[in-house]
């Protein structure tokens, strides 16, 4: 089966490589041509446009930064996709957006599968992300081999729109955990504890989290380099708070966390790494959160 892949950012490039290594034919495009340079040696075909990818592949996967870009790319690829093709959307969208996009695709005879992912760039590199899927059962079955080339767990959440809800929930939790980890580490530092030892103690405790193990380590290194921007965090928190209003659920922690990210964007810019919210505390208290022995970037070996 031949898949097209559009969007070769922090996640997409790894996903395309893993699909090719699993034996799929893969054609790719990114608005930044240099993003595809490293993929050529893997036998991946680089196309000159998104529409060329659609004309070449049996099915098209997109992994893009926001719904506006997803819609623009979708409008470009649909006229060149086969009527029996599937569009697999791995970007994080709101539920209403993905339902609307699915309807637009259906007008061209193209079916939609949403498959946002969670786990982080270091897991994408080794094909161990968690795939959160929404769509028809037969489409999930058809594309499970490709999905399992990119991840090691698939959760079929229900119809189109359901995966968007759970993806936003998981990201909301991650951002809340990141704020909590930043505050916990600062408490440890100001309390006179060795930060490295404190990190390990938290990791072994009931207060541990995936975010503490991963992004907490990058805070202690000082790189903050998780490959996920403050702008993307604010986008996803906006989706979460929108769901809260729609479903009548007060989201006090998410609201407070959003304000922290707003402050971090004002201080460091929207392209800054999301763990840089810890810098707000560091600068406020004139106290850094550095400790020896923590990685600059996450890999499967260094995470946790």
Protein language model features and the residues they cover:
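NAD(P)+-binding Rossmann beta1-loop-alpha1 motif at the extreme N-terminus of oxidoreductases
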Residues: 1-62, 84-85
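Rossmann-fold dinucleotide-binding core
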Residues: 8, 93-171, 175
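Hydrophobic beta-strand scaffold residues
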Residues: 26, 46, 112-113, 154, ...
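Residues in the short beta-alpha loop(s) of Rossmann-like NAD(P)-binding domains
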Residues: 31-32, 66, 136
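Rossmann-fold NAD(P) dinucleotide-binding segment
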Residues: 50-111
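Helical "substrate-binding/catalytic lid" subdomain
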Residues: 142, 162-284
């Amino acid at each position: 089966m031949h898949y097209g892949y559009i969007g070769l950012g922090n996640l997409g490039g790894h996903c395309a490589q893993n699909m090719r290594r699993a034996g799929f034919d893969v054609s790719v495009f990114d608005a930044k041509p240099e993003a595809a340079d490293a993929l050529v040696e893997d036998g991946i075909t680089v196309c000159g446009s998104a529409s060329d990818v659609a004309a070449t592949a049996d099915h098209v996967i997109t992994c893009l930064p926001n719904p506006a870009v997803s819609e623009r790319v979708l409008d470009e690829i649909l006229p060149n996709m086969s009527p029996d093709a599937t569009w697999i959307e791995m970007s994080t969208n709101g539920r209403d957006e993905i339902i609307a996009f699915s309807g637009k695709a259906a007008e061209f005879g193209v079916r939609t599968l949403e498959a946002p992912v969670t786990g982080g760039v270091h897991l994408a590199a080794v094909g161990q992300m968690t795939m959160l899927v929404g769509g028809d059962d037969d489409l999930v079955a058809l594309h499970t081999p490709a999905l399992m080339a990119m991840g090691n767990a698939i959760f079929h959440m229900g119809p189109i729109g359901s995966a968007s809800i759970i993806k936003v929930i998981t990201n909301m939790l991650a951002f809340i955990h990141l704020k909590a980890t930043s505050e916990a580490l600062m408490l440890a530092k100001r309390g006179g504890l060795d930060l490295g030892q404190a990190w390990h103690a938290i990791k072994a405790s009931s207060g541990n989290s995936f975010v503490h193990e991963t992004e907490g380590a990058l805070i202690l290194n000082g790189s903050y380099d998780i490959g996920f921007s403050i702008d993307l965090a604010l986008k996803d928190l906006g989706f979460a708070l929108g769901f809260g209003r729609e479903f009548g659920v007060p989201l006090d922690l998410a609201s407070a966390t959003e304000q922290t990210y707003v402050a971090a964007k004002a201080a460091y810019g929207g392209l800054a790494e999301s763990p840089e919210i810890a810098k707000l505390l560091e600068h406020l208290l004139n106290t850094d959160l550095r400790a020896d022995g923590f990685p600059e970037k996450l890999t499967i070996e260094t995470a946790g």
